[in-house]
Design a protein with these regions (language model features):
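Short helix-capping/linker segments at secondary-structure and domain boundaries
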Residues: 42-47, 127-137, 195-202
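Catalytic-loop motifs flanking and including active-site residues across diverse enzymes
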Residues: 33, 116-119, 185
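Conserved aromatic-histidine-acidic binding/catalytic patches
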Residues: 25-29, 137, 177
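N-terminal Rossmann-like or analogous alpha/beta NTP/dinucleotide-binding catalytic cores
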Residues: 1-114
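Short, mixed-charge aromatic SLiMs
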Residues: 59-64, 144-152, 210-219
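Catalytic adenosine-cofactor/nucleotide-binding cores of aminoacyl-tRNA synthetases and other
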Residues: 81-169
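Helix-rich, typically C-terminal accessory recognition domains appended to large enzymatic cores
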Residues: 174-224
Length: 224
């Protein structure tokens, strides 16, 4: 896996073996980014640990965004620190890699206080984490895409089962492994959804497989 180290100003390879990711500060987008990084790393190595430096974001509970409870922890053993602002030296060990996430304007978040948290998660994953979000426009796009994908999965679930498309799964996972390129991973799913040669059952299994990394509740409407 490779990420952009903001402190060194270049792409770096993450070390092999267990990975400790630490979130500094209460930034919501930093927590979402760190969660996807942790999920992606856990699929490629034996263990990935996610900790935080202080209280989680407010007013939304992180569980609403499909981020598991993140325990408080010490950054001293972290290999990656994720933050929305440059942390003080004590909060980011010299050996650690720093992922700086572009923060969300508080006014943008307050205007979306009634939005579904998973829709906001999709909106955040629709843009590179180092670039600004265009809210509420991207939230509207995310809402439409989620609705369309969930309807497709509910339809595909009525078809015979098929093995997932390993090519599409590998392409999406490779995108996430390259500086967490979530927009490219989402584009792979769009390509698969539109592929007339892929069986509905294969599409379903591939979407489910990748949703374990993206955590977008794509199976929500199956059986409804």
């Amino acid at each position: 896996m490779r990420i952009h180290d903001s402190r060194r100003g270049r792409a770096v390879d993450l070390p092999p073996g267990p990975l400790h990711i630490h979130v500094h500060g209460p930034g919501l987008r930093a927590f979402i980014t760190a969660d996807v990084l942790c999920r992606t790393a856990a699929r490629r190595r034996s263990r990935a640990l996610l900790t935080r430096s202080g209280p989680p974001p407010r007013p939304w509970p992180l569980t609403g965004f499909n981020v598991p409870d993140v325990p408080a922890g010490d950054a001293a053993s972290a290999q990656v620190v994720v933050a929305e602002q440059d942390p003080p030296e004590a909060a980011c060990p010299k050996a650690a890699h720093l992922m700086l996430v572009h923060p969300i304007e508080p006014s943008s978040l307050s205007s979306l206080a009634d939005e579904d948290p998973v829709t906001l998660r999709m909106a955040m994953l629709s843009a590179p984490y180092r670039e600004p979000l265009r809210l509420p426009e991207q939230a509207a796009d995310a809402r439409a895409r989620l609705g369309r994908w969930r309807a497709l999965l509910a339809e595909w679930a009525r078809s015979p089962g098929r093995p997932m498309s390993r090519r599409h799964a590998a392409d999406a996972e490779a995108a996430l492994a390259q500086d967490l390129d979530s927009p490219a991973a989402l584009a792979v799913l769009e390509e698969l959804a539109a592929d007339p040669a892929a069986a509905p059952g294969a599409k379903l299994e591939t979407f489910i497989h990748l949703d374990l990394l993206l955590a977008l509740d794509l199976v929500r409407d199956i059986g409804r």
